[in-house]
Curated annotation (Swiss-Prot):
One of its GO terms (cellular component) is ribonucleoprotein complex. NCBIfam families: S21p. The gene is rpsU. It comes from Streptococcus thermophilus (strain ATCC BAA-491 / LMD-9). This is Small ribosomal subunit protein bS21. One of its GO terms (biological process) is translation. Residues 43-58 have a biased composition (Basic residues). Residues 25-58 are annotated as: Disordered. InterPro entries: Ribosomal_bS21, Ribosomal_bS21_CS, Ribosomal_bS21_sf. GO terms for molecular function: structural constituent of ribosome.
Amino acid sequence: MSKVVVRKNESLDDALRRFKRSVTKAGTLQEARKREHYEKPSVKRKRKSEAARKRKKI
């Protein structure tokens, strides 16, 4: 869980911006979206294989 302490004389917008950056860097939101619905192992393997094929192509 990302945690941001609001500094003295820091606006709430700046603290929110730092929080969003830390969440993005940690990959928390992406992980939550990935786990939102169950994905069968066969589908997971297929997606992983297609991603590798796409990376290799480029």
